[in-house]
Amino acid sequence: MAFIVALGLVITGICPGVLCFPDGTLERDTLFHKDKENGTQLDSLTLASINTDFAFSLYKKLALKNPDTNIVFSPLSISAALAIVSLGAKGNTLEEILEGLNFNLTETPEADIHQGFGHLLQRLSHPGEQVQISTGSALFVEKHLQILAEFQEKARALYQAEAFTADFQQPLEATKLINDYVSNQTQRKIKGLISDLDTDTLMVLVNYIYFKGKWKMPFNPRDTFESEFYLDVKRSVKVPMMKIKTLTTPYFRDEELSCTVVELKYKGNASALFILPDQGRMQQVEASLQPETLRKWKNSLRPRKMGELYLPKFSISTDYSLKNILPELGIKEIFSKQADLSGITGTKDLIVSQMVHKAVLDVAETGTEGVAATGVNFRILSRRTSLWFNRTFLMVISHTDVQTTLFIAKITHPKRA
């Protein structure tokens, strides 16, 4: 099972005059932050809850703008990229970003937010024997642009960001440089992240997450068969349906929200929650998504012996222009001439012109790779506890050690790439 995500953020100049940096050769400058285990004032559980709050707020906007379509994204990738930008933001621009990420600045100092992210990303970067998680950021900077040393050092130390120089006066070459980097970091699952660069581009920030996990209890490929997946009460498609017999797995029936929740664990420190709303109840479940709901589901899970569990095998991908979505969460100024990103270069002449998020989700028998009444006889939970994920459902992948939501997906059409 794989989940692969990449995000690209393009920063352009409002006016000329911020240029002057020594040489134009490609340079790579990497510094990994060695976080001491003395912790941070923003503990991991609080940060996880805040990130989940942002994740569900963003999910609701995506669902509203993309009805009846697959949704796949990594809230952690998006919030980490925005947090890096906030290192160079000031005034109202800074407040918009951090408050848009659901931080209360009267309760949590900005420095603690960055230390919290740094601690989280450092823990995620520890290689695991069973679950593979790779996350990182990179700054591609116009070869003549002078970046403030403080911004670059903080991006390195807290967010493990790599720094490269690029010649944006040659947009095609710069685009290839960035897209090749992202492709290599995501096992070649994400290609063409950035497009339409022009000579006004001064900096591109990319953030990526690659996740690959093996099911603790894998499906047998010999049991996979063609079966119906219901798009709505009138339409269905044939999909490869995976099947597993006689398993005991964490299970919860939420009568209040009319949905069934099952947890399938990966080997190692990750798990996936699958949420199957009753027919016609998806909007009710979506409206209730918040950190408290996720906590309730996880705390209510109990081992349940199941006769059979059926889950579609699929590979889907999505891409979003976050420039059209984040303003609805209060993050507006970075895309306008009012932006104050002077902590990056020392001058107020930068704006974010593009923010693109791409995600790929593969679910198969061995695991995950990552790069929603009438007229239809839906097969639902029965007395013998057989569960069919044969209609629209939600999926939430979490890192169990730091209790952080890594990815969220809504599967409406398993065959639509």
From Swiss-Prot:
The record marks L381, S382 as: Reactive bond. One of its GO terms (cellular component) is extracellular space. Residues 367-392 are annotated as: RCL. GO terms for biological process: response to cytokine; response to peptide hormone. PROSITE patterns: SERPIN. Disulfide bonds: none annotated. CDD domains: serpinA3_A1AC. It is found in: Secreted. It holds the Pfam family Serpin. Glycans are attached at N38, N104, N184, N269, N390. Residues 1-22 form the signal peptide. Its main location: secreted. Keywords: Glycoprotein, Protease inhibitor, Secreted, Serine protease inhibitor, Signal. GO terms for molecular function: serine-type endopeptidase inhibitor activity. Belongs to the serpin family. The reactive center loop (RCL) extends out from the body of the protein and directs binding to the target protease. The protease cleaves the serpin at the reactive site within the RCL, establishing a covalent linkage between the serpin reactive site and the protease. The resulting inactive serpin-protease complex is highly stable. Variability within the reactive center loop (RCL) sequences of Serpina3 paralogs may determine target protease specificity. The single human alpha1-antichymotrypsin gene (SERPINA3) is represented by a cluster of 14 individual murine paralogs. This is Serine protease inhibitor A3C. The lineage of its organism: Eukaryota, Metazoa, Chordata, Craniata, Vertebrata.
